């Protein structure tokens, strides 16, 4: 029963994010067709829309994050994707590798959540000689 509730919560969260992504700041960050976002982080005119691959994160299994970065011209550059657990004051045991795919799209591979709880994704972005750190939370069961 608890597993079913977790799946329902994740599906509801994804639907809310999809509606928010589709309606808020659509001109600032257009999501290509077929890209079903898991989350979004915004700060000072920079937006990162991302999805996890696979969409459902399994504890103890590696996963990837595909991110789209939008913002002022020239396009901001994503320099790092990481995650940590603020309540536990620790991060992942693995360092993901980040690769640029062009047109503001990036893929980080090798992420792994080893325990349930609230995780915070961190995106470091450089634009106009300035570094900005964007973050957003995700509950993992």
Predicted regions located by residue number:
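Bacterial N-terminal signal peptides that target proteins for export
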Residues: 2-14
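Signals and flexible motifs at protein termini associated with secretion
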Residues: 6-8, 23-27
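Bacterial N-terminal signal peptides
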Residues: 11-23
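Contiguous segments within soluble domain cores/interaction surfaces
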Residues: 27-141
């Amino acid at each position: 029963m608890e597993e079913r509730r977790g799946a329902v919560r994740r599906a509801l969260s994804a639907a809310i994010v999809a509606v928010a992504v589709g309606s808020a700041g659509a001109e600032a960050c257009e999501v290509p067709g077929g890209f079903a976002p898991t989350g979004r982080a915004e700060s000072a005119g920079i937006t990162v829309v991302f999805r996890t691959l696979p969409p459902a994160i399994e504890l103890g299994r590696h996963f990837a994050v595909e991110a789209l970065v939008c913002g002022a011209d020239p396009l901001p550059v994503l320099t790092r994707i990481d995650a940590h657990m603020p309540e536990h004051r620790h991060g992942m045991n693995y360092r993901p590798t980040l690769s640029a795919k062009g047109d503001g799209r990036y893929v980080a591979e090798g992420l792994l959540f080893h325990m349930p709880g609230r995780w915070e994704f961190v995106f470091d972005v450089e634009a106009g000689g300035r570094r900005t750190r964007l973050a957003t939370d995700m509950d993992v069961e």
